[in-house]
């Protein structure tokens, strides 16, 4: 398979995120904002350290940025600051829904997200889809409709979570030649700066449990930095619509955990809907034109 490493990176990232609720639930007695604060601040510190040890990369990318056209510079800045903003919104709403609504509701958000990402990639990036892929998208929409039919509140929360991440994926698609890890570092640091003014006002009592800080450290490294970098790596050559559909892996893993580990109730309607969504993932990738045509590096497009 062409671009096997990029497919593998995307699959690994979304599988890791599927287990997020397993790590997050032990922190359920902490406010969503507190978890978000410490997660982002911890990630920002680690990313700042990494930038310090990669000053040569920083200098190279600074020279690259100065050599770009005005339009491309604005594109890089939008990826940096817009990406940081969308990530912050996505993280907050996801944590809030997991700890205050249900794990299934958070999983549902990442069933809606692939549909939104695919449609946005088609509308904004003009990514062409085959008839078979549109059929797969329609099948996924029907599955989401079945799941959300009697759960309107869950559906609304899910759309907010999904839209924030779908927009993040779409705006990261174009490759301006910048170092992906450096871009991610800037996004996380910007997210921390966005949250910093709110910390003194909205924070709760300073956590005293050692387990809290160990869990946050684990989340910062293995559930934030690693999967986000894998995601950006995959976006170097895979289309946003392809990444969006592979994102279905996250809610499928989360759904299995919700039923088996958290013992949340499930009915035949949900099983049918999730089965339709699994089938849509298979069909979308089966009808992917990249399986039959040579891949074109995105770095050569738009240059």
Give the label of every model feature segment:
Residues 1-38, 50, 85, 93, ...:
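Glycine-/small-residue-enriched transmembrane alpha-helix faces in small-molecule transporters
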Residues 11-19, 23, 79-100, 146, ...:
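Hydrophobic alpha-helical transmembrane segments of multi-pass membrane transport proteins
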Residues 16, 42-46, 109-123, 190-194, ...:
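Alpha-helical transmembrane segments of compact multi-pass small-molecule transporters, enriched
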Residues 31-89, 116-117, 164-167, 185-202, ...:
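Transmembrane alpha-helices of multi-pass small-molecule transport proteins
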Residues 40, 144, 151, 212, ...:
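C-terminal-most transmembrane helix of multi-pass membrane proteins
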Residues 44-72, 139-153, 190-211, 256-266, ...:
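Membrane-interface helix-cap regions at the ends of transmembrane helices
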Residues 47, 120, 124, 129-148, ...:
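Hydrophobic transmembrane alpha-helices of multi-pass small-molecule transport proteins
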Residues 94-96, 112-134, 147, 252-271:
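C-terminal transmembrane-helix exit sites in multi-pass transporters
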């Amino acid at each position: 398979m062409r671009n096997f490493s990029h497919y593998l990176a995307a699959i690994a990232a979304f599988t890791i995120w599927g287990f997020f609720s397993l790590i997050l639930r032990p922190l359920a007695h902490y406010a969503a904002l507190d978890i978000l604060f410490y997660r982002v601040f911890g990630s920002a510190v680690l990313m700042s350290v990494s930038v310090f040890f990669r000053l040569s990369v920083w200098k190279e990318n600074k020279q690259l940025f100065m050599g770009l056209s005005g339009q491309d510079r604005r594109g890089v800045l939008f990826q940096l600051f817009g990406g940081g903003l969308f990530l912050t919104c996505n993280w907050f709403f996801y944590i809030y829904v997991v700890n205050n609504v249900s794990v299934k509701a958070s999983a549902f958000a990442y069933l809606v997200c692939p549909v939104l990402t695919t449609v946005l990639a088609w509308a904004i990036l003009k990514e062409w889809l085959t008839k078979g892929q549109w059929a797969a998208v329609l099948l996924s929409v029907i599955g989401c409709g079945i799941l959300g039919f009697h759960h309107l509140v869950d559906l609304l929360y899910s759309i907010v979570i999904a839209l924030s991440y779908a927009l993040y994926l779409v705006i990261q698609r174009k490759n301006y030649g910048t170092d992906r890890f450096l871009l991610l570092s800037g996004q996380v640091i910007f997210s921390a700066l966005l949250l910093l003014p709110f910390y003194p006002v909205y924070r709760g009592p300073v956590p005293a449990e050692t387990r809290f800080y160990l869990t946050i450290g684990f989340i910062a490294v293995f559930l934030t930095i690693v999967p986000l970098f894998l995601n950006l790596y995959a976006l170097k050559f895979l289309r946003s619509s392809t990444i969006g559909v592979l994102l279905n892996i996250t809610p499928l893993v989360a759904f299995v955990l919700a039923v088996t580990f958290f013992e949340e109730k499930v009915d035949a309607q949900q099983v049918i809907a999730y089965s339709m969504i699994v089938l849509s993932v298979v069909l979308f990738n089966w009808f992917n034109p990249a399986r039959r045509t040579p891949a074109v590096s995105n770095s050569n497009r738009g240059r």
